[in-house]
Amino acid sequence: MKHIRNFSIIAHIDHGKSTLSDRLIQVCGGLTDREMDSQVLDSMDLERERGITIKAQSVTLDYKAKDGQVYQLNFIDTPGHVDFSYEVSRSLAACEGALLVVDAGQGVEAQTLANCYTALDMNLDVVPILNKIDLPQADPERVAAEIEDIVGIDAMDAVRCSAKTGVGVDDVLEVIVAKIPPPEGDPDAPLQALIIDSWFDNYLGVVSLVRIKHGSLKKGDKFKVMSTGQNHTADRVGIFTPKQTDKTELKTGEVGFVIAGLKEIHGAPVGDTLTLAKNGADKPLPGFKKVKPQVYAGVFPISTDEYENFRDALNKLSLNDASLFFEPESSSALGFGFRIGYLGLLHMEIVQERLEREYNLELITTAPTVVYEVVMTNGETIYVDNPSDLPAINNIEEMREPIVEANILVPKEYLGNVITLCIEKRGTQVNMVYHGNQVAVTYHLPMAEVVMDFFDRLKSTSRGYASLEYNFIRFDPADMVRLDILINGDRVDALAMVIHRSNIRHRGLALVEKMKELIPRQMFDIAIQAAVGSQIIARSTVKALRKDVTAKCYGGDVSRKKKLLNKQKEGKKRMKQVGNVEVPQEAFLAVLKLNE
């Protein structure tokens, strides 16, 4: 056990984490040069394309150190993006130390900071590493000072390397051996193993990545999943070198995989504890929290006969993504679909893109909403994630909206823009600290404002330099109302949205004007109204097309024309009573665009 080192890498997007891991694998000879592929660990096409890491992965490498000993390095890859922070906290729970990789040109970013604090809270040893020193704009001295100033860990003797050219990678390996402590655990205690991640393999069933905290797990052992209480047999155990390699047992402190032929991922929830079926441990390992979706949206297939395929696709996707939540939903305008819960906007985009790409579905997504806490007049509290489920106004005592604490790091020349944006989004400033050239601002913002377009706006007002990290803190009472769109007096459920009372005039007007352009003209007038409760706040009318019924009369008496015009008038009146209006799909999409 003295020769095991478990570590993960904390880094902001694009600071070179995946490239560094490629180098470590190459130096330790995990893959031959021919098999080496850039970003080995990002196995999803989407991960490669966007250059981000989504799922946690692990690799076990043997490294012969300068002191002549062979060390087993277990490296657990973590995502760097704010939406996947739960994946990060889980990866960190399996380690004793973390490498803090910072781009020597760009310096510290907000998400790096957030994940770094998570690591320090878990009592991990954080080892700073300055990457990309081959770049002309690299300034390792300044960045080292910035790490000390902002993160508060000693960084003057931080290892300097360039993962791309391979300079200094050996020093990184030495520092892992020297600075990161070996795992602690009792090999003779009952088995306790943390599930870091699970994914679904078409041939093997569910593959779980585990870290053995105490005891050991042998091939053929019967084990129990603690949260569900079910027993399974370990058909295969082993490690990734990145290639899957079978072993006879996983010992204390090691990280590896277990395959038990499970059919669905919920049988081995991520973050859960495994123990032996006989003489098992009494209590699970700490740190298992069920992850709650923060953002909900209705998703509908464009053609209704795709519904079955859509359902299968979601089921398959949720095999790999334990944080995905979905339930069937039907809408009078869009047909049958699902209400899907996501961790955040990036997660939402990625899920939608994977559905469209891997399963060839064409989908429409309604505007994302957050979960509101509603206190009813009869005293009960309900949670609502869909605007059309909101009770009538007179039954609501008060509405509370979720508030997030957003930590923003921004260069000081853009501070003014960022503050203006936060105020416009109804934020309250909590804290502001200057660190050299960067400013760390903390705001409490309504989550509904953050999920709409906050991130994009933040990036554009700061020319891409600001970085954001947020987490949910509490529900606060707020004056929120539901804005309905009525077409000829009928509510269109897919267009309802929950917004703050101060925005309703502006939003209502913009919506009805937009709808007016998109709904095709009929033979009768169509009234488009925006309403809150029973109060109409904006209206526009799509004028009727007129057929010239008097064209065939020339000359003659005026009463003849009057008769024809009156007949037309009667007909229009009748049509207006029975005619219903098809709302084209462009109209729905336009409303979603309007939020941006």
From Swiss-Prot:
Keyword list, A-Z: Cell inner membrane, Cell membrane, GTP-binding, Hydrolase, Membrane, Nucleotide-binding, Protein biosynthesis
| Domain of life assignment | Bacteria
A Pfam family assignment: EFG_C
Q: Where in the cell is it found?
A: Cell inner membrane
Q: Which GO terms describe its biological process?
A: positive regulation of translation
* Gene Ontology CC terms, in alphabetical order: plasma membrane
Q: Where does the UniProt entry say this protein principally localizes?
A: membrane
The EC number(s) given in the record are 3.6.5.n1
What catalytic activity is recorded? GTP + H2O = GDP + phosphate + H(+)
Residue span, tr-type G domain: 2-184
Q: What membrane topology does the UniProt entry give?
A: Peripheral membrane protein
* Enzyme class, broadest EC rank: hydrolase
List GO molecular-function terms, semicolon-separated: GTP binding; GTPase activity; guanosine tetraphosphate binding; ribosome binding; translation elongation factor activity
SMART domains named in the record: EFG_C
Read off the InterPro entries from this record: EF-4, EFG_III/V, EFG_V-like, EFTu-like_2, G_TR_CS, LepA_C_sf, LepA_CTD, LepA_IV
Q: Which residues participate in GTP binding?
A: 14-19, 131-134
Q: Does the UniProt entry include the keyword Cell membrane?
A: yes
**Function of the molecule:** Required for accurate and efficient protein synthesis under certain stress conditions. May act as a fidelity factor of the translation reaction, by catalyzing a one-codon backward translocation of tRNAs on improperly translocated ribosomes. Back-translocation proceeds from a post-translocation (POST) complex to a pre-translocation (PRE) complex, thus giving elongation factor G a second chance to translocate the tRNAs correctly. Binds to ribosomes in a GTP-dependent manner.
Similarity annotation: Belongs to the TRAFAC class translation factor GTPase superfamily. Classic translation factor GTPase family. LepA subfamily.
Q: HAMAP family given for it?
A: LepA
Protein name, per record = Elongation factor 4
Organism listed in the record: Shewanella putrefaciens (strain CN-32 / ATCC BAA-453)
Q: What is the lineage of its organism?
A: Bacteria, Pseudomonadati, Pseudomonadota, Gammaproteobacteria, Alteromonadales
